[in-house]
Amino acid sequence: SEALAKELGVKVKLQATPWDGILAALESKRLDAVVNQVTISDERKKKYDFSKPYTVSGIQALTLAKNVDTIKTAADLAGKKVGVGLGTNYEQWLKDNQPKAIIKTYNDDPTKFQDLRIGRIDAILIDRLAALEYAKKAKDTAAAGDAFSRQEAGIALRKGEPELLEAVNKALDKLRADGTLKKLSEKYFNADVTQ
């Protein structure tokens, strides 16, 4: 967000906002943009404008390492207790793709991860990059199988601000062309996740 703001010639003011209220904060004009790995979906595009994608990832199941072989596909989630963030695309994806899963929603990540590690839930659905990063730190967990779907994240903006959308896209194009996006990606994710 800081590189983007610099490119746009504006001052950035980072504002910590709970995920389940972040898009509402955009709608109510408490935020001008959401730069927080917001997955671009058809449903969200009805309400918000999105920049060109700046990261690409996927929906990943995170399990205890000892259970990693129990989940390879979405079909394997049937009958399992699966933790997801309340109001996230992971919750919606699970409802749409595996209605036989037992969905447990969470308002915060620490409780969700704790419930996985103590066995209250069988898996968590999160971003593949986050799953790999978490499993690196918590050796008793592992990313199970391949990512379930490709996800592109963009900067969410209010509808009806075409000049801002165009400026953001031009800034992202420049940051991609000069290698800044790739460098930031490798710094934070240890991989180029910009394509």
Model-derived features: where do they sit?
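Extended ligand-binding regions for polar small-molecule ligands
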Residues: S1-E7, N67, K81, L86-T88, ...
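Bilobed "Venus flytrap"/periplasmic-binding protein-like clamshell domains
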Residues: S1-K6, Q60-Q114, A123, R128-L132, ...
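Acidic, polar ligand-binding/catalytic clefts
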Residues: E2, K6, K11-D76, A147
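Soluble periplasmic/extracytoplasmic beta-strand elements of cell-envelope proteins
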Residues: K11-Q15, A33, Q60-L62, K81-G83, ...
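Short helix-initiation/N-cap motifs at beta->coil->alpha
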Residues: K13-A24, D69, K104-Q114, I118, ...
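Conserved functional loop/turn residues at catalytic and ligand-binding sites
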Residues: A16-G21, K29-R30, K81, N89, ...
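A ligand-binding cleft/hinge motif common to bilobed small-molecule-binding domains
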Residues: G21, N36-K47, L94-D96, R117-S149
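Periplasmic-binding protein-like
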Residues: V56-T63, R128, L132-D173, F189-Q195
